[in-house]
Amino acid sequence: MVKERSTELVQGFRHSVPYINTHRGKTFVIMLGGEAIEHENFSSIVNDIGLLHSLGIRLVVVYGARPQIDANLAAHQHEPLYHKNIRVTDAKTLELVKQAAGTLQLDITARLSMSLNNTPLQGAHINVVSGNFIIAQPLGVDDGVDYCHSGRIRRIDEEAIHRQLDSGAIVLLGPVAVSVTGESFNLTSEEIATQLAIKLKAEKMIGFCSSQGVTNDDGDIVSELFPNEAQARVEAQETAGDYNSGTVRFLRGAVKACRSGVRRCHLISYQEDGALLQELFSRDGIGTQIVMESAEQIRRATINDIGGILELIRPLEQQGILVRRSREQLEMEIDKFTIIQRDNTTIACAALYPFPEEKIGEMACVAVHPDYRSSARGEVLLERIAAQAKQIGLSKLFVLTTRSIHWFQERGFTPVDIDLLPESKKLMYNYQRRSKVLMADLG
């Protein structure tokens, strides 16, 4: 019997290896809302968390219990009370909160302990540690309303948490914390996860909600948001009356975490099997990232980028779309190239060849990775090349193209005669290739 080979599996593994190396030894804070815990996909999420641990990632898991607490209150016919969208935790509510949180802690610990069963890592031991790593204090009284046992973080024993992470344990923390006087307080999982990510200097904070991240007006996933954009989303949702959805709660924390030094905060769906792995081990992820600095950068190319440029343009050269360039030619002309990189992969490039005497520049070798051609990378490159041309005193920009005529025309270029090319370029014109000449004023 001949075994079938899966090239998709091979390609996926090759693409994931750089991320495995990057993530190893880093600290991730994972926030699991009560909605995620009660979903049928939760066992898969726990298995994926166990897999992350086996890859050497330091994990702090924070769980919430909102729906479980509400169900407990309803079962005991105890009406929940809120003030300014914050739960008021009276003595009776506190007992039910502790009951729900305690049950979840035992359940999650048990699931994590067996998460690697039925895998090649079966028998590997996962140590899950919980404790009084967080000291709480009361929220107090606001507008005459006593929040009772609703609290906030007073301090975090980050050194003790680091010791547990150094020993290879997963740290598991829930919504109940104690004060210096021995009282118990009900805290939000968002505050706990956010403050832990900040204090532990975590590389990432990861949250789960019902949808696959934040969407735009067309319903498409927004892959990246800066903190000010995420804050605007929160304010818009609050204006619409949404104060406590999983997305809004996470975004509030993500904005604060990013502004306090956490590099990336990820929002993904608890309903999608494997979403955690797809988000962390693929170039584009599957959800929404909140970042201070984009995973994508546009910059001038250096000699170290030649390999990436060649890998990008070779298929287009083989199809006859681009004129062939040797490695030696690229090495000599690398200072003319601008590239767009995403997670150290070159996904687009273009070059500017100036003709100073005629005050004209050529935009050449324009290439965009097939996975990104439906996005605006071409426009981004055009804007950058045009800006570079104006900066050095050029007044016009031209292109020679056989396939992208309409694309350039839609962006202000018009067909012109070959005679309008700079003299040196005119002498090099390939009449067999018969490229169209298009030109635009830079203004």
UniProtKB/Swiss-Prot annotation:
Pfam families: AA_kinase, Acetyltransf_1. One of its GO terms (cellular component) is cytoplasm. Pathway: Amino-acid biosynthesis; L-arginine biosynthesis; N(2)-acetyl-L-ornithine from L-glutamate: step 1/4. GO terms for molecular function: L-glutamate N-acetyltransferase activity. Its EC number is 2.3.1.1. Keywords: Acyltransferase, Amino-acid biosynthesis, Arginine biosynthesis, Cytoplasm, Transferase. InterPro entries: AceGlu_kinase-like_sf, Acyl_CoA_acyltransferase, Asp/Glu/Uridylate_kinase, GNAT_dom, NAGS_kin, NH2A_AcTrfase. GO terms for biological process: L-arginine biosynthetic process. It is found in: Cytoplasm. It catalyses: L-glutamate + acetyl-CoA = N-acetyl-L-glutamate + CoA + H(+). Residues 296-434 form the N-acetyltransferase domain. Homohexamer. NCBIfam families: N-Ac-Glu-synth, PRK05279.1. Belongs to the acetyltransferase family. ArgA subfamily. This is Amino-acid acetyltransferase. It comes from Escherichia fergusonii (strain ATCC 35469 / DSM 13698 / CCUG 18766 / IAM 14443 / JCM 21226 / LMG 7866 / NBRC 102419 / NCTC 12128 / CDC 0568-73). The lineage of its organism: Bacteria, Pseudomonadati, Pseudomonadota, Gammaproteobacteria, Enterobacterales.
